[in-house]
């Protein structure tokens, strides 16, 4: 391994090779820009881009570089959504927890991995810091590893370490990590959070995401006891519960006493908390998102969101019609693992309408919409109007329950659709 410049390091990338770019809040921007600067020298480089946040513009995905880089997105993030919609790349539909296996078995071969790493510790180990998720498996499988050694990256434990000698080239940087502002819940989101918190027992194990609704749920859990954390994404919202002892991980079966996550999305305060924190481990997403590992914890509470839900309980979470706007992430993994957990419950939490006023509960999904969580798996749908408990209910009963938590402006329309579809078995049901 040698320290060098970014321009020199990316000369290890060859035409017709495949490159994995670390994602989350950990895009190795210095290396990626240097790679894009070589567009005129490179042809047919397959790029695997992961979930990402922030304003980084993904120069490899732009039209002028279409002959140089072929973008395969493992999660359609904001920075590439426009270019993929215009045909300058494609998404790969896959459960996040299964992608590491695709790296490992060669389905998605990785020649080069571009990584954003912490400074090495005394033993020479660097940490993936805020983004173990796919980076662990990609680094394990790639023939060539190029790393940014970043002063701003926290050192996290778990699977998220690699010896600096494994790197073919390293570039020293001091690049601030992307910070995700803490979303302030709206009144509707606070009501949703309250409904969910009331259904969470003491001793539960939480899987929860980022945004207004997750923050509302977490804020409503201050009076709970002995909660655990086994989640895909670590956020600022859990810190008050950890600091107050509400989350103590004492009842977990998998890694008791320790919080488990695969990536982190938050503020510098969160990243500083993670630095050499022995009460937190960052794991390969194939490990965190394994439903059969998730189920081993007691009372798993899996809380996820959706783009839209139909009257049978089908959940679309990654597209608006045929237009892919995100990825499935770990929703399916945790909804399945949570359902299998003893005492577990799963939730799809959504405001009743979009910001533009369209109902998120529909008679039928928008044509072309992809189903992420099937109607056979969904348990509870929650809006600001209440909780529709779908587990064990027939289709007419599901329709009634979902209409009752839809926005009042669309309930009559939904009732007509349900009556036409289910006839007397729906009409006999009372509100």
What are these regions (language model features)?
Residues 1-431:
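Conserved alpha/beta enzyme-core scaffold
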């Amino acid at each position: 391994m040698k320290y060098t410049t970014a321009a020199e390091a990316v000369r290890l990338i060859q035409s017709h090779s495949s490159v994995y770019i670390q994602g989350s809040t950990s895009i190795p921007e210095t290396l990626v820009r240097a790679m894009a600067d070589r567009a005129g020298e490179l042809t047919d480089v397959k790029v695997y881009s992961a979930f990402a946040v922030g304003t980084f513009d993904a120069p490899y995905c732009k039209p002028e570089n279409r002959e140089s880089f072929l973008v395969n997105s493992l999660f359609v993030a904001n920075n590439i959504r426009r270019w993929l919609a215009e045909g300058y790349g494609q998404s790969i539909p896959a459960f996040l927890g299964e992608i590491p296996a695709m790296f490992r078995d060669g389905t998605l071969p990785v020649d080069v991995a571009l990584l954003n790493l912490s400074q090495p510790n005394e033993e020479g180990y660097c940490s993936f810091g805020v983004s173990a998720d796919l980076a662990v498996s990609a680094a394990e499988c790639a023939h060539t590893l190029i790393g940014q050694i970043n002063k701003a990256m926290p050192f996290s434990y778990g699977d998220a370490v690699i010896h600096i000698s494994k790197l073919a080239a390293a570039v020293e940087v001091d690049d601030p990590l992307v910070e995700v502002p803490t979303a302030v819940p709206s009144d509707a989101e606070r009501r949703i959070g309250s409904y969910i918190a009331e259904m969470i027992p003491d001793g539960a194990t939480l899987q929860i995401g980022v945004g207004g609704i997750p923050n509302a749920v977490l804020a409503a859990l201050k009076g709970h006891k002995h909660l655990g954390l086994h989640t895909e994404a670590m956020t600022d919202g859990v810190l008050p519960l950890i600091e107050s002892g509400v989350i103590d991980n004492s009842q977990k079966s998998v890694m008791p006493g320790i919080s488990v996550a695969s990536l982190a999305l938050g503020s510098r305060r969160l990243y500083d908390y993670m630095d050499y924190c022995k009460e937190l481990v960052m794991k390969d997403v194939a490990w965190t998102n394994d439903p059969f590992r998730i189920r081993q914890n007691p009372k798993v509470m899996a809380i996820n969101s959706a783009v839209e839900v139909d009257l049978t309980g089908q959940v679309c979470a990654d597209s608006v019609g045929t237009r892919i706007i995100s990825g499935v992430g770990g929703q399916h993994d945790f909804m399945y693992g949570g359902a299998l957990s003893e005492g577990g419950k799963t939730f799809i939490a959504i405001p009743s309408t979009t910001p533009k006023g369209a109902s998120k509960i529909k008679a039928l999904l928008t044509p072309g919409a992809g189903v992420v969580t099937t109607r056979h798996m969904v348990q509870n749908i929650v809006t600001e109007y209440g909780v529709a408990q779908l587990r064990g209910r027939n289709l007419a009963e599901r329709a009634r329950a979902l209409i009752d938590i839809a926005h009042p402006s669309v309930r009559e329309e939904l009732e007509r659709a349900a009556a036409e579809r289910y006839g007397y078995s729906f009409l006999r049901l009372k509100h």
